Regions:
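Glycine-rich flexible loops
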Residues: 7-413
Length: 413
């Protein structure tokens, strides 16, 4: 199955860029910020680059504060904003010098990092700056772009991914082993850049890609260039079709089993959930793979997705010609096993992480019913659809890697 129909298109338009500058000048915003909004939207509107709040961008510029002084600031994507429809308030300005002052600090907890970033906002009412704010600050370029490009994850999320990256991306790119987003990742990036000041791109294993330049168009062009390189490299690999289970019919429709699934989701007095059903050609291919229980449980395409879809789906295989009653008893067992598996997963990983963590409810966010389709789960319809969109992307990336190699994600931590 082909992951991409076409090589990624560069959508930059000088005319539209100038229109953004004029529009935002009237609203009191600089051309720096206007162009940042423009290319952030260009990146955010391509679903093969980012989805639903994923990715981030920044620009280093100067802003006059209420005291009349000019401050060097980092305007970086804030939480709660999507790149696809960002506005200047979605790029909160953080004073740059206090961020740079921590370059040599050895450790900063997530809580202290968030507090420090908020303390240095120009406008305290702004949204929280990205968890990757320090990373953006430590790269000495005006414009920094970050996406979770499907094609890049296809290159990184496989055995030998590190060497494959070196071969694909060339000598202007540094490859970074996986580090959880936050201050320690920013420190690692600073260390790598200091040793390789000629690079214009970073590939973060199992995470995504950063490109940077002092010109907005150039940073965007670099993103398109390197993601296109990844696309071309994957297209050249030898591929094999994934073995599929046999097609069979059941004596029920998706809409008949939806109430059963919804009831089981709330069976242990968890919050009430909404579910969304979908099926398309590549989801069908993913769900009906003989090895779906193996490859779907290895991890999401990028850790960002875990927040919305949990680390693994629940999978149900109905029996041939099974009735709705038979499906119900099959589903009850599957849900019981999933809840036990999730509790085990949390307990194992909780011991490995500093600080106290609170376990979420034990209900799945994605249910794959073979020969039927996918049911995505959320607290409302929008959240359920987002879980579905992310699973759609995970299905594309995982099956594409499985066709050419073996899907591999970061070890559990």
């Amino acid at each position: 199955i082909s992951l991409w129909s076409l090589i990624l298109k560069n959508n930059w338009s000088k005319k539209i860029a100038n229109e953004y500058i004029k529009k935002y000048k009237k609203l009191g915003f600089s051309s720096d910020l206007a162009l940042r909004v423009y290319t952030t939207r260009l990146l955010g509107r391509n679903k093969e680059l980012v989805l639903h709040g994923g990715g981030n961008t920044s620009v280093k510029t100067t802003i006059k504060d209420i005291d009349g002084k000019n401050y060097k600031v980092l305007c970086v994507k804030g939480s709660g904003w999507d790149m696809a429809d960002i506005e200047p308030p979605g790029l909160p300005a953080v004073k740059l010098e206090p961020l740079l002052a921590l370059k040599n600090k050895k450790y900063l907890s997530d809580e202290d990092m968030v507090s420090y970033q908020k303390r240095n906002l120009i406008d305290i009412k702004s949204p929280n700056p990205s968890v990757e704010t320090f990373l953006h600050a430590f790269l000495p370029f005006k414009y920094v772009d970050h996406t979770h490009a499907d094609a890049v994850l296809n290159v990184t999320n496989r055995p030998g991914g590190l060497n494959f990256c070196k071969k694909v991306f060339g000598n202007k790119v540094s490859i970074v082993p996986y580090v959880m987003p936050g201050f320690m990742l920013a420190k690692k990036i600073h260390e790598i850049y200091s040793k390789n000041p000629n690079i214009n791109c970073l590939i973060l294993m199992n995470h995504g890609i950063f490109t940077f330049a002092n010109n907005c168009k150039e940073a965007y062009d670099l993103m398109i260039k390197y993601v296109s390189k990844a696309e071309r490299a994957v297209k050249k690999l030898k591929s094999k079709k994934l073995k599929q289970i046999k097609k069979f019919s059941t004596k029920f429709n998706p809409h008949e089993i939806a109430p059963i699934i919804r009831g089981l989701l709330s069976d242990n007095k968890d919050q009430k959930f909404v579910i969304n059903y979908r099926l398309n050609s590549h989801l069908k291919y993913f769900i009906n793979g003989k090895s779906v229980r193996t490859y779907s449980s290895k991890g999401t395409a990028t850790p960002d997705h875990v927040i919305r879809v949990k680390p693994f789906p629940l999978i149900i295989t109905p029996k041939k010609n099974s009735t709705i009653e038979e499906f119900r008893s099959n589903a009850i067992k599957a849900f019981e096993n999933y809840r036990k598996k999730y509790i085990r997963y949390f307990n194992i990983n909780h011991k490995k992480v500093k600080g106290k963590k609170v376990m979420l409810d034990t209900s799945p966010r994605v249910i794959l019913v073979q020969n039927v389709g996918m049911f995505s789960v959320g607290k409302d319809l929008n959240a359920a659809k987002i879980a579905g969109d992310l699973t759609d992307t995970n299905a594309r990336v995982i099956t594409s890697v499985e066709e050419t190699s073996t899907y591999k994600f970061i070890p559990e931590k």
